Structures are given as C-alpha cells and as structure tokens.
C-alpha cells in the first residue's frame, strides 16, 4: 500500500497538469503527417528563438558534445532540449526497477499514474535545471541580470520544456507519427550532419582558405591545389580548430558516418522469427519478429540523460567547491572534464586519444555498454514490451505460438525477450562507442539515434500506408 500511496501523492496535482486528450477515433494518415509536420515546425522555430534577457551565452559549455543528443540549442528557448523529459523517464524507470515504487502495468489506473508521475517530475526537473542554468551564470552574472530578468529566464526555459512535453504527448497519443523526442533528435542531427558535410562557410587557417563542409572542401582543394596527393590527404584527415574554436570535419568523418548508417540499417534485419497462428481464422499463420535492436534507441537516450545530468552537476559543484575531494572525484573541469569520474565517462576526443589513454577508453566502453543493457532491460518492463505484455497482446488478437499451448507461450517469450533486451542495449552501446572512436560527424550516439529514428519512421510509414491490421509494437519508441 505504501508504494501505491507514493503514486497517489501526485494525484492532487493531476487537475493542474496540462494534458492532450486522446483522439476519439483513428486519425487519418494525412492528418498524422500534418500534425507531425506542425509539431516539428514549432520545435524548429523554438530552437532559433533567443532567450529574452541574456547578457551573454559565451561561457564554457560542459554539455557541448551532448547537445546534439539532447536536441538542445545554446542560448535559445531550446536550451534544455529534451533533457527534462528523458531525465524524468530515466528516474522513474530506476525507481520502478529498484522496486522503490511498485507499478502494476496491467492496471489502467497504475499506467495512468505512471505517466502522470513522469510528467510531474519532468516539470519539476525543467524548473530545477532552468534555475541552475541562470544562477550559475550561463547567461551572465545574476547580480548583473537582476531578480526580474533571472525569473523571466527561468520561466522561459520551463515554459519551453512544457511545450516540448506536450508536443511529444501529442504525437504519442496518436495524432502524429512516432515519438516527438525521437523526431526532434533526428531532425537536429540530420541538420548537423548535412551542414558539416556541405557547409559553404569558409575559414582562413594556416594552409589557406578552407570550407567547413567536408565534401565541399574536398572538391575545392582537389581543383585548386597543385599537389593532388597533399590535397587528398588534407581533405580526408584535416584536423585542428579555427580561430573561432570550430573543429573542421573531414572526409573520414563523413564516410565514418555513412558506415554507421549502413551498419545500423543492416542490423535492423537481424531478428528471431517466432511462428504464430490464429485461433480465430483457421489456416492463418505468420511470425512475430523479435529484433536484435529490440529496444531501438531508447537505452542510449537514457544513458545520455544520465551522463548529461552528472556532467552538469559536476561542473556546477566544481565551480563552487573546486578544492573539495569528493567534488574533484566527480570531475575536474576546464573547457571539458580533464580528470575524475566525468572524464572517464565521456568519450575520447579522437581515436588517437583513445590509444593514448586506454584506461579512459576501457572505462567509457564498459560503462556505456553496461548502462545501455541495464536501461534496455528496465525499459521493456514499463513500455509494454515485456514477455507478459507481448503474450497478452497476442492473446487479445487470438494468436498463439505454433507448436505451443496457450499456457506455455509466456514461458517461451520469457526465454527470448529479456535476452534480446540485454543484447539490444549492449549492441546499441557498442555501436555508439565505435561511432565515437571512428569519428562520425557530431557524435557517435547522435548518429546512432538519428539512424534508428529514421528507420523506425520508415517502418511506421510502411505500416500506415499498408494498413497493417496485425502490427505489434516490436521496437517500442520513447515514451
């Protein structure tokens, strides 16, 4: 009862929490496309609208390499990105997984309370993160800004996070396609990859004029340099920062990104086909596929939320208590973490750095793969993709496993699905690590999230167009 009372503590706030009503009937495909486009447009506009009242946003950014993963844009309404939503999801999953909160997903009331707790916690986290950003001087010294501007900045950030929460809920309720969180991440990262590959912006560095876009720069140097071998080497392996501290991408980064795209798409076809038959329609037989990437991009998204919050807290504490032993254990910071736990949990800056500090590399690889595997296992229990949930879905459609009695179907699914979840998380973590070490454009995690999301939308579009009446949620999207 105590666990249920904990959930019930949020009930009094339910009337005050904004909610998108579920559609009364199935939304036509064209309307889903329209709502998805409108949702994306609102997000992109918010990503370009600067915060009102900031003095400066030029201070060092401890979350720079995570911004693509969090769909965040510095100094705009999307400063926090999807961080409050994903952090809330992560915390509630950990509480449920550790049985500090007991939720029976078979009960509709418990499922509704679970969603309510996630939303309530996301709003609290948004206000907390916004307050921390403002009071730590991310936009100028609070003394210079004044109490009124500080409060206005906090309200802007929190309100923007609430809008993102509602946009995601709009799509999740069935008005649009897929998940708002995944859509926002994929869009931001596709934009970033395209820009780094084809940007026409020029920079003057030591060896002359360089284009920011790796492909554009390759064409330019091959036509303008007399030494073609040197031009080819420079196009593939150029490195270094511009005067404005921008890391120029090269063709190796571009092809590494394409390689990651190809590998992820290739792995999408790896699956275990479970034969099923209908009890209602005699002679109907089909298969229920359990994919290798069973939980899709969810594990790496939650792992990124965990590390981003750790890094932000570590940076915040280091700025105030830099001589404290425990604070230094969490992380010693300059522009990025240089030692401590935050350093070892962040990816190596390059493949060369990975070889120079193998302990850092091994800790990062182990943590990423283990955290992703753990989150993957926790996720299936709360997302409707556990063996018991799948067995109920099949039973509700009067489908049973061929060669098995109805009573033994759950046992067989329990043998397959948890293993698939663990393996899915570990593989996704390994892909993210490999992408980082290969030097994919942006970050390995961002490219992985982008690829899995695009493929997920491709599959969903196929189902919508074909009107598949037997489609089951094989790779659950982010709630």
Swiss-Prot record:
A GO cellular-component term linked to this record:
endoplasmic reticulum
Could you list this entry's UniProt keywords, alphabetically sorted.
Endoplasmic reticulum, Membrane, Protein transport, Translocation, Transmembrane, Transmembrane helix, Transport
A Pfam family name for this chain?
SecY
What's the gene? sec61
rRNA-binding keyword on record: no
- Which InterPro entries does UniProt cross-reference here? SecY/SEC61-alpha, SecY_CS, SecY_dom_sf, Translocon_Sec61/SecY_plug_dom
Per the record, the coiled-coil ranges are none
Segments spanning the bilayer are: 35-55, 77-97, 120-140, 147-167, 246-266, 355-375, 416-434, 441-458
Q: What family is it from?
A: Belongs to the SecY/SEC61-alpha family.
Task: State where the protein is found.
Answer: Endoplasmic reticulum membrane
Name of the protein in its database record: Protein transport protein sec61 subunit alpha
The record's note on quaternary structure and interaction partners says: Heterotrimeric complex composed of SEC61-alpha, SEC61-beta and SEC61-gamma.
Q: Which residues lie on this side of the membrane: Cytoplasmic?
A: 1-34, 98-119, 168-245, 376-415, 459-479
NCBIfam families with a match to the protein in the record: 3a0501s007 (TIGR00967), PRK08568.1-5 (NF006341)
GO molecular function, a single term = ribosome binding
What SUPFAM superfamilies does the record tag this protein with?
Preprotein translocase SecY subunit (SSF103491)
Q: Which domain of life is it from?
A: Eukaryota
Q: What does this protein do?
A: Appears to play a crucial role in the insertion of secretory and membrane polypeptides into the ER. It is required for assembly of membrane and secretory proteins and is essential for cell growth. It interacts with other membrane proteins required for protein translocation. Upon binding to sec62/63 complex, secretory precursor polypeptides may engage sec61 to begin membrane penetration event. A cycle of assembly and disassembly of sec62/63 from sec61 may govern the activity of the translocase.
Q: Which residues lie on this side of the membrane: Lumenal?
A: 56-76, 141-146, 267-354, 435-440
- Give the species: Schizosaccharomyces pombe (strain 972 / ATCC 24843)
Q: What does the organism's lineage look like at the top?
A: Eukaryota, Fungi, Dikarya, Ascomycota, Taphrinomycotina
Q: How does this protein lie in the membrane?
A: Multi-pass membrane protein
Tell me yes or no: is Repressor among this UniProt entry's keywords.
no
Q: Which terms under GO biological process does the entry name?
A: post-translational protein targeting to membrane, translocation; protein insertion into ER membrane; SRP-dependent cotranslational protein targeting to membrane, translocation
